[in-house]
Design a protein with these regions (language model features):
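Transmembrane-helix motifs of polytopic, lipid-linked glycan transferases
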Residues: 129-153
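Membrane-interface helix-loop-helix junctions at transmembrane boundaries of multi-pass membrane enzymes
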Residues: 329-352
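Hydrophobic/aromatic-rich transmembrane helices and adjacent perimembrane loops
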Residues: 368-389
Length: 398
């Protein structure tokens, strides 16, 4: 798809790309939908990058355009700020100021280039927001169908903490959120069939693969934690043992990690073949940077807490947290369980994975706290789901 993307070129695509970049430039680099809430911040800087990369027009060889992630960044003109110059789309050929961004797949290029032929950017934003809303409703309906209605408050609140309007309107955030919701829906609807056909670890590997292909390292762990929590919840309604569920959950985590890592290594390998040593050197520098701490003045733990505080520092979110905790406490009191289901403790796995991810990639989590905090919303979901699974209603399912 990356190769065929640049064969798509229409006047409408160029016009819509130019209008979109102009609009984002007018809005500023990082506007907030709700003032003071970093969770509602839109990353217009990266959205401009995505649009200029997807709609790039050049006379470069097709392979180089497909794997370099080229865009045109014009220098500031008289009386023009750096941001105004950056938020300018150019379809001049040959492009005088090409900037490569080769470490990512830029898998969005084909779809976005095609969609820009049909829709203006604002129409596309509304369609993405609708797609997210539709998948959210589908996931909730499937949770009811599979007898997981007790998890709906935990699921809804955890997703709400990610600021759904920002997820739907921001080009950078849309791929991960849509893939995560689609994975949840497929798992809820087709879990027995997936187990018999491809196998659940392979299904999770495909999730990791597609996230890596379409995402620019935003909050990919959401695509693991949310489906994994639903899988654990589904399995606690069967007769699977603690050991059997532990093995299954771990294999799914390994599958996701392998799919994610192998897709990235494939990109690096192709970079080497197409772009030579320069492409690999750029990737190596970024790996070292992202695995470093956020700076000498901030420990990894400080950066983790800063990400958590995107949610916990806001009064509105604290009220919601207290309301959910009160609801969960009332649930436990009403059920008065005589014994607990120990398999629910496996929710510690999707709770810990986002924490470990944030600690490992602390440089990235420090630079981009306003969206990397969303990785931890999977941990919120696991924490909120724990009481419901520890003391479940006994309605076994196949």
């Amino acid at each position: 798809m990356s190769l065929t993307a640049f064969l798509i070129d229409t006047p409408a695509m160029r016009e819509h790309a130019e209008q979109a970049v102009d609009l984002l430039g007018y809005e500023s680099a990082s506007p907030e939908i709700v003032g003071g809430f970093a969770s509602s911040r839109l990353d217009n800087y990266t959205a401009v990058l995505i649009l200029k990369t997807a709609a790039y027009i050049g006379d470069d060889p097709l392979l180089r355009m497909a794997f370099s992630g080229l865009r045109t960044d014009l220098p500031p003109q008289e009386d023009q700020t750096d941001w105004e110059a950056y938020a300018t789309y150019s379809d001049a050929v040959p492009s005088p100021n090409n900037v490569p961004y080769s470490r990512y797949w830029h898998g969005y290029t084909f779809a976005l280039r095609l969609l820009l032929c049909l829709f203006t950017f604002t129409n596309l934003q509304m369609l993405l927001l609708f797609a997210q809303t539709a998948l959210l409703l589908l996931t909730v309906l499937l949770m009811v169908r599979r007898g997981l209605q007790q998890l709906i408050p935990a699921f809804a609140v955890s997703w709400f903490f990610m600021s759904p309007p920002a997820l739907g309107l921001c080009l950078q955030s849309a791929p991960v959120s849509l893939i995560a919701l689609l994975a949840c829906s497929l798992l809820l609807a087709l879990k027995p069939a997936l187990s018999r056909s491809v196998g659940l670890p392979v299904f999770f590997a495909l999730i990791g693969l597609f996230v890596n292909y379409f995402d620019l390292l935003t909050f990919p762990v959401v695509s693991l934690s949310f489906p994994l929590i639903l899988l654990i919840a589904l399995e606690t309604k069967t007769t699977i043992s603690f050991g059997g569920l532990t093995r299954e959950a771990l294999l799914c985590c390994v599958g996701w990690a392998l799919g994610y890592a192998c897709m990235w290594m494939l990109k690096w390998g192709l970079n080497f073949l197409v772009l030579g040593q320069d492409g690999i050197a750029a990737v190596g520098d970024q790996i070292s940077l992202r695995l470093s701490a956020g700076g000498e003045s901030h420990s990894r733990l400080d950066i983790l807490l800063r990400n958590i505080r995107i949610v916990t520092d806001k009064t509105a979110y604290r009220v919601i947290l207290l309301a959910v905790l009160a609801l969960l406490l009332a649930l436990l009191i009403r059920r008065r369980p005589r014994r607990f289901d120990g398999r629910a403790l496996l929710l510690l796995l999707p709770l810990l994975v986002p924490v470990l991810w944030t600690l490992a990639l602390s440089n990235h989590a420090s630079d981009h706290t306003y969206f990397t905090y969303r990785n931890l919303c999977g941990a919120f979901f696991a924490l909120f789901a724990l009481p419901a699974l520890l003391a479940p209603d006994r309605t076994p399912s196949p």
